[in-house]
Amino acid sequence: MKEMGVIVLLLLHSFFYVAFCFNDGLLPNGDFELGPRHSDMKGTQVINITAIPNWELSGFVEYIPSGHKQGDMILVVPKGAFAVRLGNEASIKQKISVKKGSYYSITFSAARTCAQDERLNVSVAPHHAVMPIQTVYSSSGWDLYSWAFKAQSDYADIVIHNPGVEEDPACGPLIDGVAMRALFPPRPTNKNILKNGGFEEGPWVLPNISSGVLIPPNSIDDHSPLPGWMVESLKAVKYIDSDHFSVPQGRRAVELVAGKESAVAQVVRTIPGKTYVLSFSVGDASNACAGSMIVEAFAGKDTIKVPYESKGKGGFKRSSLRFVAVSSRTRVMFYSTFYAMRNDDFSSLCGPVIDDVKLLSARRP
């Protein structure tokens, strides 16, 4: 009998380890396609905190089918048939096994359902970020957001919370497609002083969703989902992949989607008085973002403006900035001079793409 008890305990331990074990991609039931039973529902409201498999709920949480009608608005789910809506002070939580001291990025889809200034609080203790989702970057109303954290223990409680207090308790954001990816921050090499200059290391990109992933401003993100880089602006930048967009080099790149309000930067070690060359690619993502574009690149106090005539069908050009370092640390930064909209829907923000950014020392001419 004692041996049987030991076997049962071992089986239970094995079950919980498998249940919480992390792999890059969607979290268990991260797309919410496994839903609650009818007995756990009151209309669209979920009344049992453990009714949605793999998730723990708190507050007014709704289970929304694609095509659900809210007033005059039809709610569309970006992928699959279901999503969840978080009412006032509502949250969803899932525990995942991680490696203490390692970095991870979280990706999720979110959409506003009301006109209020909606926000989301994403957290893995002790880290958290309040993400404004008022600005809609795509015509579908759904945007993919990313956030990153450093694991403080071997388990992480991922919480997505709606901190809003609205007159209508059901007036909250829709959430879908929650995924996670382990990050491996790159180091400078003898071929590039910049870290992650090709943007190959970044958040998880959901397959079959062609909107790209928004990386929020650094002011609300202690650990960047784009290792090595900071988003030093009021608006997000967009992380794009070669499966859905035209990318100058490799499989990933960054699209500057909000003019001068959308900038990426990195601080690098330099030797005062030494000459350096900053080289990079400027192009378009083949997403109908056509017109005259200008990317402004900065290296310390030096700058260059790179014009690019986009036909919205892909393509790029190389450019470079030669400068002499004036301090032991130099800030490299990029932003777009102008705002742009896709010419096929006139409501999706877009902009020039930057990629393959390199910084090397050079001899003076």
From Swiss-Prot:
It comes from Arabidopsis thaliana. Disruption phenotype: Decreased PME3 activity in leaves associated with empty short siliques missing seeds or with heterogeneous seeds, as well as several morphological and developmental defects, such as abnormal carpel morphology, decreased stigma size, septum with engrossed regions and badly differentiated ovules tissues. Misshapen embryos with modified methyl esterification status of homogalacturonans in seeds and associated with abnormal radical and embryo bending. Interacts with PME3. 'BIIDXI' means seed in the Zapotec language. Transmembrane segments: none annotated. Keywords: Auxin signaling pathway, Cell wall, Developmental protein, Glycoprotein, Secreted, Signal. Glycans are attached at residues 48, 121, 208. GO terms for cellular component: extracellular region; plant-type cell wall. PANTHER family: GENOME ASSEMBLY, CHROMOSOME: A01, OS02G0527500 PROTEIN-RELATED. This is Protein BIIDXI. Induction: By auxin (IAA and NPA) and gibberellic acid (GA) during germination and in roots. Highly and early up-regulated in roots during root-knot nematode Meloidogyne incognita infection. It comes from the Eukaryota. It holds the Pfam family DUF642. Mainly expressed in vascular tissues of roots, leaves, stamens and petals. It is found in: Secreted, Cell wall. Together with At5g11420, acts as a positive regulator of PME3 activity during several developmental processes, including reproductive organ development, hypocotyls elongation, seed germination and endosperm (testa) rupture at the micropyle, probably by modulating the pectin methylation status in cell walls. Involved in the regulation of pectin methylation degree to modulate cell wall physiology during cell separation, hypocotyl growth and embryo development. GO terms for biological process: auxin-activated signaling pathway; embryo development ending in seed dormancy; embryonic morphogenesis; gravitropism; pectin biosynthetic process; positive regulation of seed germination; regulation of auxin polar transport; regulation of cell wall pectin metabolic process. Residues 1-21 form the signal peptide.
